[in-house]
Amino acid sequence: MSELRGYLAEGPRVGIRPFTYEDGAEFIDRVRESKALHHPWLAPPASPDAYAAYAGRLIEDPTKAGFLVCEKGDGPGVEGGAVAGFVNINNIVQGGFLCGALGYGAFAHAAGRGLMSEGLELVVRYAFGPPLRLHRLEINVQPGNAASIALARRCGFRLEGFSPGFLYIDGAWRDHERWAITSEMLKR
């Protein structure tokens, strides 16, 4: 049923689907509306050219997978539901590792409504099943990003460590906490 409606997976309130180039206008509008929510933690693409390059990497690069978390309903967008947020799996490694690094963001209109919890859980389940069949997913979060840490915790990720100067963001090397989940830990 989900595939007939364009979703890779769906829950009671949201479905997840791949990024498309056609989502650019809505995505950019949502990014602009959410600038205060995202700063200083992330900077999603906010122009048509930046979105096209970003979506292109997620669509074409086999070491990445991008998912839009969409509200189920009668709003704008390919599925009729507004885009509530996004979840990307980056640095996908196959072979003996079977791991990927997650990045995600909610849009302001959806923040605090539980939609990203549902969406992230759907992405995790999808990533551990076919076609990706990953074994481990990691999230690296700046220690001050309480909302992202709470989301990781709600979705069953465990804190594994601290990485000083892990990622260059907004002009400086930022410390990160490392959270992870394995297929064995997945909430059944």
What are the language-model segments listed below?
Residues 43-44, 67, 168:
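Sparse recognition of residues in long alpha-helices and their boundaries
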Residues 44-46, 56-58, 101-103, 177-178:
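Short, charged/polar low-complexity linear motifs in solvent-exposed/disordered segments
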Residues 33-36, 60:
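Short helix-loop boundary/capping segments at the starts of domains
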Residues 56-68:
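A short helix-loop-beta-strand connector motif used in the catalytic cores of GNAT acetyltransferases and
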Residues 1-26, 30-34, 70-188:
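Acyl-donor (CoA/ACP) binding surface of acyl/acetyltransferases
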Residues 36-56:
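Conserved GNAT-fold acetyl-CoA-binding loop/helix
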Residues 19, 30, 43-50, 61:
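Generic, well-ordered alpha-helical segments
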